[in-house]
Curated annotation (Swiss-Prot):
This is Putative polyol transporter 2. Belongs to the major facilitator superfamily. Sugar transporter (TC 2.A.1.1) family. It is found in: Membrane. It comes from Arabidopsis thaliana. It is a multi-pass membrane protein.
Length: 511
């Protein structure tokens, strides 16, 4: 038995002076991992403007355009579905590399596309990369971050999605000045650039300590934990918690061990998730799927993907004005996502989710009402209705970004037990991308069938149902170690009790 192993076998009683803020290393890891989310954000943002020019250049129908806008999210189901098993097989780090590779190839294919089938092939390849990226970034960050800053760091993927969206909007505005048949190809092709930086950045990242423990590499896991914990005691405590969660006895402390009854390769995981889940795992799965469904079904991608169309229907007639207003949406969304990220560990997950969804409901109701009034008064310039429509688009993305945007990824990636986390998180991401694809591929048809105002009133109804679901089903997880979160789920009375306990624990930790 190694001496380092003996040192990790028990938590020593003597407290060690803090060795500087080691969370800076976790911060850097979260930044690098979350860069994968830029690729999805850029695609969402750039397609909102590029679609205007692609439709004219390739002579597409509305149905073809809808499919083109939303199909990437359907294709991403392949990547999301495979990401859980892949990340358990090759590790979280190299799964991030794989995501970047697929999107790099897809972006180049889209940039060089000469017809509709060609560009669809590019979106297929890029979609697989997006699926991998959306699952692995929050899981990796959650597993690296200490409990005290897990919410803040785990919400980074949403920040980078918004940075990507903003970059896409800005790209639209500048490349729109090029000839039509060239501009949209530059808009899409330049999306390959972030993937290159991602591949370089991954070389500086450590592997997830929880994945290393599942492989029996305790020595390597401790080195990562030691770099991301404020004290050596904290690192030892985190390692012991992970070992217990994986099922490794306390007396197994060598740097490399054979994990007893190893199930992390996938055996029994899907059975434990879907066929015979415990009450707590069933509750966790419902919470994960529910929060992902609610995030997308409340209409965020309808606004982000079709902002120019919405502003056109609201009364902004020139393409330049529509794209400028769309850039403003990106700026507001990015600013408020930063605010939400800073608040998630201070006020907790539930408070931000409930506040966010309530604000989204009021914004959607006002937006739907104003667009309905504008539609029913053709030929008239109703400045108050136009102003209300533009303003409520901004308030909708702002309130979304305060809670539903960042907290969804934080919450869904932290609640699963370590053995089920990769596959459980991948199910949530698959549903998220499926709903995003459905919204993207049906919004134009929905706005014709219900009117554009009616479509947003429908989204407002979803927001009400989501608020009730959040209030009823989601316990608070702020400040609770990952290995203890499962105990919060399973029964409502236990949830309420543990919510109070977790809040008290957080206060003690902060003191």
């Amino acid at each position: 038995m190694s001496s380092s192993g003996e040192e990790r076998g028990v938590v020593v009683a003597e407290s060690e002076p803090p060795r500087g803020n080691r969370s800076r290393f976790a911060f850097a890891c979260a930044i690098l991992a979350s860069m994968t989310s830029i690729i999805l954000g850029y695609d969402i943002g750039v397609m909102s403007g590029a679609a205007i020019f692609i439709k004219d250049d390739l002579k597409l129908s509305d149905v073809q355009l809808e499919i083109l806008m939303g199909i990437l999210n359907i294709y991403s189901l392949i990547g999301s579905g495979a990401a859980g098993r892949t990340s358990d097989w090759i590790g979280r780090r190299y799964t991030i590399v794989l995501a970047g590779f697929f999107f790099f190839c897809g972006a180049l294919l889209m940039g060089f596309a000469t017809n509709y089938p060609f560009i669809m092939v590019g979106r297929f390849v890029a979609g697989i990369g997006v699926g991998y990226a959306m699952m692995i970034a929050p899981v990796y960050t959650t597993e690296v971050a200490p409990a005290s800053s897990r919410g803040f760091l785990s919400s980074f993927p949403e920040i980078f999605i918004n940075i990507g969206i903003l970059l896409g909007y800005v790209s639209n505005y500048f490349f729109a000045k090029l000839p039509e048949h060239i501009g949209w190809r530059f808009m899409l092709g330049i999306g390959a650039v972030p993937s290159v930086f991602l591949a370089i950045g991954v070389l500086a990242m450590p592997e997830s300590p929880r994945w290393l423990v599942m492989q029996g590499r305790l020595g390597d896991a401790f080195k990562v934990l030691d770099k991301t914990s404020n004290t050596k005691e904290e690192a030892i405590s985190r390692l012991n918690d992970i070992k217990r969660a994986v099922g490794i006895p306390d007396d197994m402390t060598d740097d490399v061990i054979v994990v007893p009854n190893k199930k992390s390769a996938g055996k029994g995981v899907w059975k434990d998730l879907l066929v015979r889940p415990t009450p707590s795992v069933r509750h966790i799965l419902i919470a994960c799927l529910g929060i992902h469904f609610s995030q997308q079904a409340s209409g965020i991608d309808a606004v982000v993907l079709y902002s120019p169309t919405i502003f056109s229907r609201a009364g902004l007639k020139s393409k330049n004005d529509q794209l400028l207003a769309t850039v403003a949406v990106g700026v507001v969304k990015t600013l408020f996502i930063v605010v939400g990220t800073c608040l998630v560990d201070r006020f907790g997950r539930r408070a931000l989710l409930l506040t966010s969804m309530g604000g989204m409901f009021f914004s959607l109701t006002a937006l739907g009402t104003s667009l309905t009034v504008i539609d029913r008064n053709p030929g008239q310039t109703l400045k108050w209705a136009i102003g209300l429509a533009v303003t409520t688009v901004m308030t909708f993305v702002a309130t979304f970004s305060l809670g539903a945007g960042p907290v969804t990824w934080v919450y869904a990636s932290e609640i699963f037990p370590v053995r089920l986390r990769a596959q459980g998180a991948s199910l949530g991401v698959m549903l998220n991308r499926l709903m995003s694809g459905i919204i993207g591929m049906t919004f134009l048809s929905l706005s014709k069938g219900l009117t554009i105002g009616g479509a947003f009133l429908l989204f407002a109804g979803v927001a009400v149902a989501a608020w009730v679901f959040f209030f009823t089903f989601l316990p608070e997880t702020r400040g609770v170690p990952l290995e203890e979160i499962e105990s919060l789920f399973g029964s409502y009375s236990a949830n309420k009790k543990n919510n109070v306990m977790s809040k008290g624990k957080q206060v003690v930790d902060e003191q």
